[in-house]
Structure formats: structure tokens, C-alpha cells
A protein has these predicted regions:
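Metal-associated gating/positioning segment near the N- to mid-region
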Residues: 109-117
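Alpha-helical scaffold elements lining the catalytic groove of polysaccharide deacetylases
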Residues: 228-232, 236, 702-705, 710, ...
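Gram-negative bacterial Sec-dependent N-terminal signal peptides
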Residues: 2-29
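Non-catalytic, conformational "gating/processing" segments within enzyme and secreted inhibitor domains
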Residues: 173, 178, 185-186, 199, ...
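Hydrophobic, small-residue-rich alpha-helical packing segments that form membrane-like cores
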Residues: 180-194, 198-247, 252-266, 275-280, ...
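Short secondary-structure capping/junction motifs at helix and strand boundaries
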Residues: 174-182, 198, 650-658
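M16 family metallopeptidases and their MPP-like homologs
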Residues: 71-73, 78-97, 101-105, 120-169, ...
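Proteolytic maturation boundary segments
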Residues: 28-72, 258-329, 335-343, 347, ...
Length: 963
């Protein structure tokens, strides 16, 4: 039951450890009746056949006579759409020594020709039905599985049957044409080059340290480049015949369709599949070796400073039963307490680390055990290590308190209860992913109600002694094994780490001190008011409301997601009001919400609001500052009180700002370790002609930044002008009026907003470059990036023209994918897109970028010139336009069935009625575009003499040597 264990770790984490720390996830009673007779046998039965947990009866589970499993579930969120997943029970662990990387390579070849689909046609065939390459048509290979993913824009017979046909071709009809294989080698090499970053190299070293002598450490999915470049066709065919077989396959279909019909369509497509070749062997993963305290250092510039401490044991593949889930819940409650304590330490003045987390996890069936992950600034490893070790030992020695246990039970119960309430409107793709995970882990796909029932049975009468025993057991086994990643050398090396760990284990620890319980103090904001005006926009299901103090409320009740309400409060003028000649530390805007309230610290807030679904996230936009949260109907009034409290009484405590100042330079160094990261950091400023409102400051400017500067700018801006509130989701108009009238509507009337200055409205795209702008990254010398952009227009005035340009960018994406990836094999993922500002007049651009070796940059720029010349000189075919347009339209339709789309698009509608027109015309504008329109905007904007170019190459003459 691997997936449940991993999900528990995520669900109870009390602190968000910075991405990249910890073990990496690498990827590329009653049971429903089986609805088909079974002659062939799958390699793994459905999880419910080995469990007392009932599977979700909304899912039809079955097995074809040839052994292929299938799971079919009707779900109408979003309506008329579906998701198909074809999974194979084989990944990189199943490769022989001469096949390293071929499981992943084979996944790529599924898009490169089969017996009944010519090479290059599969993607186009799906695009003609509205499936975009990458977004709706994708695949991945991990250590233990390979999966193909199709997201269907509708469930017409043509779309469903074509999609099933494509997957059926993948199952047994791939050709592995020698020329196609050779062409794809460059794409795989390009993918390896793109993914070859310090974090991945650290992960490989970590796996080797944790699992010595086991297969896992030598089977990363990307594989061996020498094999990728030279593997003969026979090796591909050998793996394909051994592991792409019906008894190793699972077909998953979720969506808005008739289950009987979908089952018949799956049977029609796959029942004739037979693979007479011998089944491939399951991988022998190797044994966990007995070990004592050990330390390993991975040192490389650009890697995150972190320490992972594990206590490892042999992996036990227990069936997914109620008893096993209860065991996992109990252990996770204890880990949640430890994570909460870590969170408190990270929020203190001069904290010992940036973040820390604890959990229990397995490493791809190879080992399992308790773990600690600590992230800190370079050079601060010793204090971080000591604090984490001693806090973990404090938990083991003294255990959790009753108050701590009750809080974590409340937190988990709240999450599970909310999931039950929204179960009927879960997203189709999320359900397909959950079924895929269940199939991979051989778990039971149970209902949220069943999950809650098991949890409640687990915590009924649960004692701290039981939790403490589970935690102590989690932190036993081989080790502790400490893996340290560092961008700078550590004096004394591994011996110093080991000595510090052993010395820390000798330091006595005291019992924990539990904070006093607080109450929510923000319930009154003045005299509640009623609206002074109300207008309905019937066709959009939206109501515009004004209050006497000038508050403007927009409400759109929806049935997209049960028990979900999204709220945004906007005020001030955002970037429009910032100076363009000096940086204001808006990069530390998280200090607003993390600083808590005048009457409650952030930690006290979390304690008071335990059991409630509310949030308060602060953001800086182009023309406003915003506070936002996600809630449910029963907590809606509290959500509005929380946002009003943050609006009227933010504490601006200094610790969160200081934490950003201390950690940001190191984080930026990590981002600069790749060409894409370095360009992302530099581009916002460069593409704004050096305007200091955009882009990031220097390390010296970060060191000199003051909280008072940020506070003054934000406070003065949001203190004047109207407050705009947008509420979307499972809410009524009356409930929204009352909650806003009691909070923001009760605030004093506000002075008029100061109009933005001409300088504030000015954002200028840079002039054309005679030679590409040079940008340096800190990664390996074989990585580079080329970028070309052309100025276009904003989305303030001619919205239809802006949408035509966005469609031009989609056509450009098709062209560069076909030319740079498919024909040349020069890059893994070339990209093209368009952006147009809704705030800054005349600001917008189209761009193309690709990561290639540095010696290929000149050729890349030539290819981009050739592609854009073709778009200017010759009108595109209707087929190509439709392939670009259909995916755009279907993506938009999908978005229009989500609350987030409306939350973003309804901003400003009180004062800008043209926004309402733009919403109404979003699809029709795209549908009206002709090939001539695409050529016209290409000629207008993709001008050679207007292009801005950049090249990103390594500052290092050679690749750094990892130690």
C-alpha cells in the first residue's frame, strides 16, 4: 500500500520544506464484481481483492480475458470531458544492464509511428480532435511503471474511439523504425541535458547512499547516455515484447460518458490484444544492508543546502487493509506533531533552519523508514542538524501531548470531511490520477467517506501512548544515515558531520512546552451595512453589488466544485504605484501574511483556526494588491473576517521579512544553476527595459532592504481607493452580501484613489538586438538556452487582435515543435507563447525559446528565423490552424468550468464593462480567426528587425565535479 503511505506524509506535513529537499519523486469486506470472465491473469489483482476495504462502487473494475485490467468511472466535472490512462507494470527497474533508459525511450517512440499510424501523424490526429501535445497528450516513465495519458475534450464516438485506437496501437503495434529511433535519440539527449541539474545529481548520489547494492540506485529513468545514443533496435523490441503485454496493463477511463458504452468500447479496442512472447521477469531489487551511523556529503555549486536523516528498514509490501491504514494514520499523527514543532522553530527570530519536515516513506519498494529533512542557508548545517536531531529525539523521548494530538486529529478530520463534502465534484483528471496511483501501489480505490470512516475508527479512543509507540518505531532501523547536500565545502568533511550528529545525540532534551490556547478575536469591524446598488449580469450568472462605503462586490455562484468558495480582495494600485528607478522589496510580500495579525501571531492564527478551512494569501499585482483565500460554506463568514482582519490589522512582524532576506540570495543561486532558471530571473527586467518594478534585485540590494519600505508602500496604497471583492463558488448572493456587509462593508468610507501616473503606466519592451544579449547561468557547460521575442500589443484595447496573436503563438508552437524537436532532434521541449498586459498599455510580446547545447545556438536562431519567415510569407493551411485552435478552445471551455477562471476574469468588471464583453467573446473570437488573420499578424509583429534575442550560456568553462 505504497501510495497511501506517501499521501499521508504529504497530508500531515506542517511545514512547507523548500522544493528539492527530501527524497525526490522521480517520474518521468464488499468488493465490486468483476464484469468480465477471466482466462488470462493480470500480474497484480485489484487491491480490493486482498483487502477488507470496499472499493468505490462508482467504479466498474474488470479484467479482459487476455488479462488486461480496466477501471471505468463516470464523472461530470468538467462536463462532456474524459481522461484515459493506459498503465504498464514496468519501468526503469525492469531494464537490463544494456537497456538503461530504454523504458523511457520506448515511451517516446509511442509518438513516432505504429503499424496503422504513420510517423508524425499520431499527435496531429489527436490535435485535430482538440487534444494539445503536452497538455492533453502525454506520458511518463518512472522506476516501476510507464503510463500514457490522454485528456479528451469531449466524449463523442470519434474522440473516444480514436483515442482508444491510439492507445491500442501503443500497446502492441509500435514499429521502432531505425530512422525514427535515430531521430528521437537527440530528443532524449536533449531531455537529459535539460534535466541534468544539481538537484537530480544530488538525488542520484542520495539513492546510491541509501540503497547501496540495490537496483534502485542504478536505474534512474533517464538512463545511460551511451546506451541512449547507441542501443540497437533489438533492445527496444526485447523490452517491448517482454513488458508491454495485456496482463501487465491497466486501462483507466474517467469522464462524462455512459459506463456500459465505454466498457464496450474498451473491449472492442483491446480484447484482440495478445502477446505470445515470454513475460519479462520482475526486477530483483536487492536487500537492505545492516548499517550503523553513516554520513555522505554531496557538494556542488547550485545544489540546495539540506540534510536528510533516515532510519531504514526492509520494505514490507503489506496489503491495503483497514489495519494498515490505521497504522499509517497513527504514525502520521505523531509526525504531524513533530512537523508543527519544526514550523514553530522556523518562524522564530534567528531560526536554526529555513524549514524542516518529518515523515515515513518508502523508496520505490526498496526500503522504508522514518526521515527528517532540514533546509538551511549554506554553511549553517551544524546548528540545523543539531536542532532537528534534538527535536526528533524530544518527540521520541517524551512523546506528544494530549493537546497536540487533539489538534492534529482536528486538522486531519477537517481535510477528510471537506473531501467527503466535495466528492461529487472532483475533477476528472484528479480521479484518473488517483486510480492510476491505486493501480500502481495495488491499493484500494476507496471513497472519501470510507477514508473518513477508517480515520474515525482509528482515532476513537486513541491514546498518546499508542501514537508515541508508533513514532518510536518509525525512528528505528539502520542508521541514522545522514545525507548532506551543500553548494560549498564543509570543513572536516563527512567526519565533521558524523561527529556533530553523535555529539548532538548526547545532549539532554527537555519535555516540550505547549502553547496556551487562544480565541478568535476579530468578529466586529463596525456597523454592518446593506448594499446601495445591485446589478445582475444574467448570461454570466454574475451579480455586481456596491456598498455605501464604496466597496464593490462581484459574486458568481457556481456548482463546479461542491463546498469550495474562492475569495479575492483587491485594493491599491500594485506595480503601477511602485517607483521604476529603485527596487521595493515586494519579493518579500509573504511577510504580510506570515507576519500575522496584531492580536495573533501566525502560529497562534493556525492554532485558533484549526478545524476551519480558511486562508489569507497576500499578492502584488500589476494594478492592485490582493488578499485571497479558499473556504467552504460553513467557514465563509470566518473567511471574510480573516481577510478583513488582515486588511485592517496586519502586524508586519519582522521575522518573516528577515527570513526572506537571509534565504533569498541562496535560493537565487540555486535557480541560476540552470539556463532556464537564469533566464527567468533576468528576463522580467530585461524585457521591461530595466524597469526596477520587474525582475529581482542584487544581493547587495537584498541585504540593504528594509521592512519599513515594503510596509510604507503597501499601506499607503491600500489605504485609499475602492475595495473590490470577487467571490466565486458554492455560495449564495445573500450569504455573500451578509458576510461582506458585516466585514468590509462595515469599514469607514475611503478617499478616492490616486490615479496612476504616466510613468507608472509606462512599461517598455526593449528595442531589437543586433547581437543576442548574453546571460550567464552557473550550471554545466553543455547547457544553453536561446530566446527570441517580438513586441506585440496589450489586452486592454483590441482584445480580439490580442487573441489572434495568442493563436499565432500556438501555431508557432506547432511549427517549432515539428522543426526543432521532431525533425532536428535538437531540443526536448521548445516553446512558444504570447503575453499581453491587461494593465500596461501597448505592452505584449510573442516569444520562442529552446534549450540546446551552446554550439547549437546559432542554428537555433536560424531555425526560428526560418519558421517565422514561413509564417509571414505563406498563409497556413486550415488543418494547421484548426489543430492550434481546437486545443485552445477546448482548454478555454475546460477553464470556464472551474472557479479559478472566473475569479481571475471577473476582476475589474465594475469599472470596465468591456471586460464583460471580453468574457462573452472569448471563444467566438478564437473561432473567427482565419489563416489570413494568422499571416496578417505574423507580418505585423514577427518582423526580423523587431526581434529581441538572448543567449544563456554557462559561466563555467567545464562541468562542475560533484564530490
Amino acid at each position: 500500500m505504497r501510495s497511501f503511505r506517501r499521501l499521508l506524509l504529504v497530508a500531515v506535513s506542517g511545514v512547507a520544506v523548500i522544493a528539492g529537499a527530501g527524497l525526490p519523486a522521480v517520474a518521468f469486506a464488499q468488493t465490486p464484481a468483476v464484469s468480465a470472465s477471466v482466462d488470462g491473469q493480470p500480474t497484480d489483482p485489484w487491491g480490493q481483492t486482498l483487502s477488507d476495504i470496499p472499493a468505490d462502487t462508482a467504479v466498474r473494475f474488470g479484467v479482459l480475458p487476455n488479462g488486461m485490467k480496466y477501471a471505468i468511472m463516470r464523472n461530470a466535472t468538467p462536463p462532456s470531458q474524459a481522461a484515459l490512462r493506459l498503465r504498464f507494470d514496468a519501468g526503469s527497474l525492469s531494464e537490463t544492464d544494456s537497456q538503461k533508459g530504454l523504458a523511457h525511450f520506448l515511451e517516446h517512440m509511442a509518438f513516432n509511428g505504429s503499424n496503422n499510424i504513420p510517423e508524425g501523424e499520431m499527435t496531429k490526429r489527436l490535435e485535430r480532435l482538440g487534444l494539445s501535445f503536452g497538455g492533453d497528450t502525454n506520458a511518463f516513465t518512472s522506476f516501476d511503471q510507464t503510463a500514457y495519458l490522454l485528456n479528451l475534450p469531449n466524449t463523442s464516438d470519434e474522440v473516444v474511439e480514436t483515442s482508444l485506437f491510439v492507445l491500442r496501437e501503443t500497446a502492441s503495434e509500435l514499429l521502432f523504425d531505425a530512422a525514427a529511433v535515430d531521430a528521437e535519440r537527440g530528443v532524449i539527449v536533449g531531455e537529459e541535458r535539460t534535466r541534468d541539474v544539481p538537484g537530480l545529481r544530488a538525488a542520484k548520489a542520495q539513492f546510491g547512499f541509501l540503497a547501496p547494492g540495490q537496483r534502485l540506485a542504478d536505474r534512474f529513468p533517464i538512463g545511460d547516455l551511451n546506451i541512449i545514443r547507441t542501443a540497437p533496435r533489438d533492445e527496444f523490441v526485447d523490452f517491448y515484447r517482454k513488458y508491454y503485454r495485456p496482463e501487465r496493463a491497466t486501462m483507466i477511463a474517467v469522464g462524462d460518458f455512459d459506463i456500459d458504452k465505454m466498457e464496450a468500447q474498451i473491449k472492442a479496442a483491446f480484447s484482440n490484444w495478445d502477446n505470445p512472447a515470454p513475460d519479462g521477469p520482475d526486477p530483483v531489487l536487492g536487500e537492505v544492508q545492516p548499517r550503523q551511523t553513516e554520513t555522505r556529503i554531496f557538494q556542488e555549486p547550485g545544489v540546495q543546502s539540506s540534510t536528510e536523516i533516515l532510519w531504514t528498514k526492509p520494505f514490507v509490501d503489506a496489503p491495503d487493509t483497514s489495519a494498515e491504514r490505521a497504522k499509517g494514520w497513527v504514525r502520521s499523527l505523531g509526525m504531524a506533531v513533530l512537523n508543527r514543532r519544526f514550523s514553530e522553530l522556523a518562524r522564530a527570530e534567528n531560526p536554526p533552519f529555513l524549514g524542516a519536515g518529518a515523515g515515513y516513506q518508502d523508496l520505490v519498494n526498496s526500503l522504508e523508514g522514518g526521515s527528517l529533512t532540514v533546509v538551511y542557508n549554506p554553511g549553517e548545517w551544524k546548528r540545523a542538524l543539531e536542532t532537528a536531531e534534538q527535536e526528533q529525539r524530544r518527540l521520541v523521548q517524551y512523546g506528544v501531548t494530549q493537546a497536540e494530538l487533539e489538534r492534529e486529529i482536528t486538522e486531519l478530520r477537517t481535510g477528510l470531511t471537506a473531501t467527503v463534502a466535495s466528492a461529487a465534484t472532483r475533477q476528472t483528471t484528479a480521479l484518473a490520477g488517483a486510480l492510476l496511483n491505486a493501480a500502481n501501489a495495488n491499493d484500494v480505490f476507496s471513497t472519501p467517506a470510507t477514508d473518513l470512516q477508517i480515520f474515525e475508527a482509528t482515532v476513537a479512543g486513541l491514546t498518546v501512548e499508542t501514537v508515541n509507540a508508533a513514532v518510536r518505531d518509525a525512528f528505528t532501523g539502520n542508521g541514522p544515515l545522514a545525507f548532506v547536500s551543500t553548494p560549498v565545502p564543509i570543513e572536516g568533511g563527512e567526519a565533521a558531520i558524523t561527529a556533530a550528529l553523535e555529539a548532538s545525540r548526547q545532549v539532554p532534551v527537555a519535555a516540550p512546552v505547549v502553547a496556551a490556547t487562544m480565541e478568535w478575536p476579530y468578529t466586529s469591524f463596525g456597523t454592518p451595512t446593506q448594499p446601495s446598488g445591485q446589478t445582475e449580469i444574467a448570461d454570466l450568472g454574475t451579480t455586481l453589488i456596491t456598498f455605501p462605503n464604496g466597496v464593490k462586490l462581484t459574486v458568481k455562484p457556481t456548482a463546479f466544485t461542491d463546498e469550495q468558495i474562492l475569495v479575492t480582495v483587491r485594493a491599491g494600485n500594485g506595480q503601477l504605484g511602485l517607483p521604476s528607478n529603485r527596487p521595493v522589496p515586494t519579493y518579500a510580500s509573504s511577510a504580510y501574511s506570515e507576519g500575522g495579525l496584531g492580536k495573533l501571531t501566525r502560529s497562534q492564527l493556525e492554532q485558533v483556526l484549526a478545524g476551519d478551512v480558511v486562508g489569507a494569501n497576500f499578492g502584488v499585482g500589476g494594478d492592485s494588491y490582493s488578499l485571497g483565500g479558499t473556504t467552504r460554506p460553513e467557514d465563509f463568514e470566518l473567511q471574510m473576517q480573516l481577510l478583513a482582519a488582515y486588511f485592517t490589522d496586519p502586524a508586519w512582524r519582522p521575522e518573516p521579512f528577515a527570513l526572506v532576506k537571509s534565504s533569498l540570495p541562496t535560493q537565487l543561486d540555486q535557480v541560476r544553476a540552470t539556463p532556464g532558471g537564469a533566464f527567468a530571473l533576468a528576463s522580467a527586467g530585461l524585457l521591461s527595459s530595466g524597469d526596477r518594478r520587474f525582475g529581482l534585485p542584487s544581493n547587495e540590494e537584498i541585504a540593504a532592504a528594509e521592512l519599513s519600505d515594503l510596509r510604507q508602500v503597501v499601506t499607503s496604497s491600500i489605504s485609499e481607493g475602492p475595495i473590490e471583492i470577487i467571490i466565486v463558488g458554492d455560495v449564495t448572493i445573500d450569504a455573500a452580501i451578509k458576510a461582506v456587509g458585516d466585514t468590509f462593508g462595515a469599514l469607514p468610507a475611503r478617499s478616492p484613489a490616486t490615479p496612476p501616473s504616466a510613468e507608472g503606466l509606462r512599461r517598455v519592451f526593449p528595442g531589437p538586438t543586433a547581437e543576442p544579449v548574453e546571460i550567464k547561468h552557473n550550471g554545466i557547460a553543455t547547457q544553453a538556452l536561446g530566446y527570441v521575442a517580438w513586441p506585440t500589443l496589450d489586452s486592454i484595447g483590441d482584445r480580439k487582435e490580442a487573441r489572434t496573436v495568442s493563436l499565432l503563438a500556438r501555431v508557432l508552437q506547432l511549427r517549432v515543435t515539428d522543426e526543432i524537436r521532431e525533425k532536428q532532434g535538437a531540443a526536448y521541449s521548445p516553446g512558444a507563447s504570447a503575453t499581453s498586459s491587461t494593465v500596461f498599455p501597448d505592452y505584449g510580446y510573442v516569444f520562442v525559446q529552446a534549450e540546446v547545447p551552446p554550439e547549437a545556438l546559432s542554428g537555433l536562431f536560424e531555425t526560428i528565423d526560418s519558421v517565422t519567415t514561413g509564417l509571414r510569407d505563406t498563409a497556413i493551411e486550415v488543418d494547421e490552424l484548426n489543430r492550434a485552435r481546437l486545443s485552445a478552445v477546448e482548454s478555454l471551455r475546460r477553464s470556464q468550468n472551474q472557479n479559478g477562471y472566473w475569479l481571475g476574469n471577473l476582476t475589474g468588471v465594475h469599472d470596465k464593462p468591456e471586460e464583460i464583453v471580453a468574457i462573452r467573446n472569448a471563444i467566438s473570437d478564437l473561432e473567427a480567426v482565419t489563416p489570413a488573420d494568422i499571416q496578417r499578424v505574423a507580418q505585423a509583429y514577427l518582423k526580423p528587425d523587431a526581434a529581441w534575442r538572448a543567449r544563456v550560456t554557462s559561466a563555467n568553462p567545464a562541468a562542475p565535479a560533484a564530490q
